[in-house]
């Protein structure tokens, strides 16, 4: 594995550009679902009541607000990769979001993690370029309350859930045999593109965030096998939108956390 860059000082200088609400930006509710893929985004939006008439544009993503079970909830997406996901998350926090679930796909790195299973990241090995710009205590972890809600909601639906480490990369076409073996040895369950950066920003800004990743393909045997048409993958994606919204709206954000730029 490549050497890590030198650690940044924990008290970083203030950025010259800070995310903030402009005159044309709407206020957003406390709860938000970040959805990486267009089809899953539409499935999540279909479950909201009393939605806005049209979405608000946020960088390359759309934002829609409605109610789920009586709770005002924002759904944002699609998005691809750490830089875009962090831009959207940073702006969403500036507009009022405090409790976030990220919904995406991942590749399996372990034989016991099957296509159609769900991984709840507990930590992420960063091989993306965004999280290094945010000085935080390492390793960063997801919100305990959101993890508890996710486990309960997904297990109640009969889904197979694995909680563990993931590998976040900027280069899916450079997932080499050597890297896969190295991250397998470190115990990583899956590989994806966004979670290391999202968890880091959530820690830096002191908001609650967790992720749920559907296993879409398999690298565990050092041969790529996709499952994009696998019935198990399709069924899990069908079940997840409602289960994630249930977990997201089950509780309010942690009372001891307020957005910060000091980690």
Where are these regions (language model features)?
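Active-site rim beta-loop-alpha module in soluble metabolic enzymes
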Residues: 139-186
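Metabolite-binding pocket within alpha/beta catalytic cores that recognizes anionic/polar moieties
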Residues: 1-149
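Short acidic/polar active-site loop segments enriched in Thr and Asp
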Residues: 98-99, 189, 208
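Zn-dependent metallopeptidase/amidohydrolase metal-coordination segment
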Residues: 196-232
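Flexible, glycine/charged-enriched surface loops at secondary-structure junctions
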Residues: 52-57, 158-164, 251-257, 261-262
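His/Asp/Glu-rich mid-to-C-terminal helical/loop segments that flank catalytic regions of hydrolases
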Residues: 221-257, 261-263
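Generic non-transmembrane alpha-helical segments
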Residues: 47, 149-157, 201, 243-251
